[in-house]
């Protein structure tokens, strides 16, 4: 289930869009491993990718939340964003390393299902609200 960047994901902020592209690229790396399904132990590689994804997501979420504060984004939508960001990180951190070691492909596929659904919802619903806010602000409508 490769995720391809599409303009529908654009949040009207070049930096956020570039960061979303990077997150998609990292999720697609995980997908490549899941598609191999060749019986080779890739535990260390998978853990490294998961840790990189978590670290990059924390960096990205920090950037977004800083933007919310700097642009005067409303507190209700900021809180929704923060809760979703925390949920994402918590999910990555909750991966049971024993389960991963025992069932690499199954664990990776389960996480991919979560990641693809979360990313689609988060960007297309939650982040696009912020993108629309930025667009209106730039147009002088706010």
Label each residue range with its predicted role.
Residues 1-142:
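Small-residue-biased structural context
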